[in-house]
Amino acid sequence: MKKRALYSICLLLSGSLTAWGQSDPIAIFHNDLRVFLGENGATKAPTGSADMWLSVEQENEWIPLIFQSGLWLGGLDDESTLLVTDLTEGGQPGTLEAPEGFDRIWQVTAEEIEQHRADLADNGLVDEPLEAIYGWPAVGNPHFLDYSGFELPDSPLAGLAPFWDQNADGLYDPDDGDFPILSVRGCDIPIIPTQMSWCIFTMFMDQEQVRPIECQLILFTFACEEAHPLNNTIFLHYRLVHRVEPGGSALFDTRLGWYLDPDLGCLLDDYVGSFPDRFAGFAYNRSNEDVGCESLPGLGTNPPAIGFDLLRGPLTIENNELVDVDISHIMPFYSPIFGSFPSGTTDPSNLSEYYNYLQGFWRDGTPLTVGGIGYGGSQTTQFAFPGFPAQPGAWTEWEANNPDGDRRLLMAYEPFELQAGAVNEVIAAITLYRDGADHLDQVVGLRDQLDQVQAYYDLCFQVENAGDLPPCTQVLTDVGEPAPAAHWSFFPNPAFQTLQIDIPDQKRGDLALYDLTGRLCASWAEIEDETAIQLGALPPGLYVLTLTDSQGRQSSQKLLVVQ
């Protein structure tokens, strides 16, 4: 079927020869796309399977799109020792302090989140708790042990799974109105994809395991009722934490890249290219008929093009401020098994060769150059095969009539210093376009679709209120931004007979008191700010007090009544 040559070096680069989390990955379905995710963060084809990492369904058959993908990270320690790790194969499931129990993937849908919010809103209590919500691995979750069978670590640097913190106490509790979200730096509004799959794993950049990289990975999608670009797009959100010991050294001349191995049906007849001004890469078919090969089915007539977009990358410090690291290069390299390519352009086999590619050089250290396959020329460049395939006189694989073979693509950033404890985000999108007139026109439409994907990201994925962009009505759910909580307080707590209510913002509201079965025990209409209410002869115990303010916003707090 497909090559396995890159696998052995990937295991070596993991920093440990221990086989972490090698059980089968789960399949995630989105529209007619299928992608796999390993509980250890692996983003590759299932081991020993004829399946690809990403496939599309055509006529009841899964057709290949991408064999595998993953982040590469490399740099120099304070003794100038080269360290490189490859996240394609994943790592040790769990956080650095608590690996046990994390050999699984947590999944949640927008429908479940909306159901939870509606359940809480009707009476201030959750009557039908959902496992996806109550078992979400977020910091402070008091229900996690009951649903998952093990305790969460106390204070991981990366904060575990992201959530909407309704009362801003820093702890996740669905009973307080909290719920899972996608958290993106700079976006202060909750992002609720149609589906999210979350895992956490740890990579070690050295055999001594003293330089760990803790990684959270969320694979997320938006499913729209309309015919929409997001129906053909999957997103990857990495959060990387450099978990060296306190006082540990930085990683210098750090390079971060995204590696992809596209196989559009037959793996031998694909071309690749780049849109440098968008920092996006793509793959397309060299002919308008994709016939199966090497036991892989083809995509048939007018095969689609697929695009790869890095929406967010690492940060560095300049003039005491955090700034985004600029793009560096997009370049291909080639399989040594399929096709006849110079050995200096094929898969890396040691740390130095990986680092060469991360720096924008070929495996043998020579630069990427204009012309042919990008090797051995005199004019150096950073971006291979830029622009649309059909450009007379331009350097593209189509115009160069490059030979058949199995291509990979690497998209990388400029060097930066990875400080001890640094937290970086990488957000990547993979989008399929198939509405073009032919295999070359697919790339023209793909560029516009990549622009739309970037625009949704720029709007913090508020897909249902996206201005001039095509609206996306999420399938099976109606999710909007949650109303801000009513601002109020009461004291004392615990209380005996009298309770004072403070509503400083709205000055008045309606108050309801429920017991833990959801039964309404008492209510007060038009309560004003700084009002004392009488609790009467309530039995001692725990209650829920819900305020509805003059704008219809609700907020619930727990009240302990004592004798």
Model-assigned labels for residue ranges:
Residues 1-25, 476-480:
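Bacterial Sec-dependent N-terminal signal peptides
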Residues 463-491, 506:
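Residue-level detector of functionally pivotal "anchor" positions at catalytic/ligand-binding pockets or at interdomain
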Residues 483-563:
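C-terminal outer-membrane/trafficking sorting elements
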